[in-house]
Amino acid sequence: MFTKKLILAASLSVILASQAANAVIGPIKISLNNEYRTSTPVIGAIATSIKLDKSDIKKTGATTFVNLLEKIPSISFEGGPGNLAAVRIRGSESKHTLLLIDGQKVTITGGQPNFKMIPLNQISRIEILKGPFSSLYGPGAIGGVINVFTDKDTNSITSSSIDSSYGSNGTKQSSFNTYYKNDASYLDFTFTDFITDGIDATHKTTGGDDDLDPSDRQTFGLNMGGDIGENTSVSLNMIDSRANIMYDNPDPAGKYENDLRQIGLGVTQKFSDRFETRVDINDQNILRHGSKYELNTISIVNELGFDSSKLSVGLMNSADKDVGNNREIKHTDVFTQWQGLIIDNEVSIGARIIDYDKFSTHTTYNFNWARDLSSTLRVNGSYGTASHLPNHYEQNLNIVADQTTLKPEKSTNLEIGLSGDYDWGNTEFKIYKSKLKDAFKYFSASPAYYKNDGIVNIRGAELSIGTDFLGWDIDTSIDYNKAIAASTGLQKGRRPNRSISLNLSKTSGKWKRNINWIAKSRSWDQDSNTNGWGQTAAELGGYGLLNLSTRYDFTEDLSIYLNRNNALDKNYEMATGYKTPGKTTTLGLTYNF
């Protein structure tokens, strides 16, 4: 099936190319702005975001995507080798984080996005948007959006590279990348092989089996495209990732598959200097522990530009299928966003109407505003709503229990902030609050099911400062967050309410050094601060991790690097009964040609 769809997509590209074979070939490759979902925004950034390019990712010393996420201070992270990874942005649930690959949603399995499907070496850049973005990206984006890009940026030059490394716990990684472009087209191909012996992730007293939990993954990615006419461009993005991840006691037994295959075709047609249309068709297949899922989406976005504003109007259809159970989650959305300048005020307004096949239509919206108070100081604010639909796990339980009245979770969000850019560096301060209504709650009846029951109030503040001192680039951030369940008045489980990060980097001749320290406060393991039997739940202690990395460039094309994660060998837990890696070392070599 996947091969047939690939042939169809390639055939469509050929047909479009043949229709414009005599046209003038122009510039190619457009990268979308993540916040406004357009390649040509007319206003500056308003949303709180974290952006990491390839060099930033290398500086962290991370060996896997989940290892990278663990180093980001404003994210509550749990998981590691041998167990599922959960990512919470600003105190929200893990299922409220929308994961995108090249702009396309990754379907939720096991109650949350599967971050282990994405190999780190395939990633060109990452953009993390904090806050509600359902109006722009659809249901699920309550806490934020993590957009992973596998394609090169527009400034890349024709080149090839090989990267190979070996590290603790028998971890071996090799990757090959080649990128070619000319005035008419581009092609980017990457292959990665990753294998590790892992660690014994769970204690025997909590269901573990006293053995290592190894994993292996082979991935290839292909990005190609170009202008096939003066006003028409096409792109084809593919990623095929196949893995076995040896979780303790998988269900069903002996099923360790963790595969992702995604293909996306995009066509952009420019009708005039002010009006263009983009069509994206995406097919995604996931195999996880013997269960098969398929996500098909098609979106059409029309952009109409004016002198100081832009209007986007789009339509999206999504069919998320649980193949084994012959069930699907379908919704059709109409969305719009206007952005522009109003008397020195930068404003964006958006809305999305979501028609979900299991219940009535609902609407989400957003209003964002910013203004430059001076040449160095900027103020911004936003207000909006977001929603989350039941995922396959929740929906299947309710169908079996004949409970079909589950409504979407909805949140209302407010944020205000100041940012400054000075000769000595930059700073940003944000405060925010969010109210989640109709939260899904699990009821252990026979059969079990979910119902709408509860409100969660979230409040927080974030401060970041960047400067340089004695040749060191210094970035620090402090985050405070409280996610309180209204029914209990208690902090939600596994959500440290304080975190701090300090990052120092320096280049001296051929040497590049990076020091990262991140600390998180204590938290409870359970939402109710009890373990379900009326006993006090385990308290997860606070911890601090020191991560070191250094790189030496023998030539412009040959480099060697050494990473030391958790250099002080800190013993800590992110979830009761689950172990985390101790001190690890990775030695690697990169060659460009």
List each model region and its residues:
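Face-selective signature of the C-terminal outer-membrane beta-barrel domain
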Residues: 225-243, 257-373, 378, 420, ...
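Short acidic/polar hinge/loop motifs at secondary-structure boundaries
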Residues: 104-132
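Short, acidic, small-residue-rich periplasmic hinge/interaction motif at the N-terminus
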Residues: 21-58
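Periplasmic-side early beta-strands and strand-to-turn transitions of outer-membrane beta-barrels
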Residues: 147, 154-157, 163-165, 177-258
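Outer-membrane beta-barrel signature, preferentially recognizing the C-terminal barrel domain
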Residues: 97, 252-263, 267-270, 292-294, ...
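Gram-negative outer-membrane beta-barrel transporters
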Residues: 308, 341-346, 432-435, 452-528, ...
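Non-catalytic regulatory/gating segments with a bias toward low-complexity or hydrophobic composition
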Residues: 69, 126-128, 146-148
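Extracytoplasmic beta-strand/coil segments of soluble accessory domains associated
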Residues: 66-104
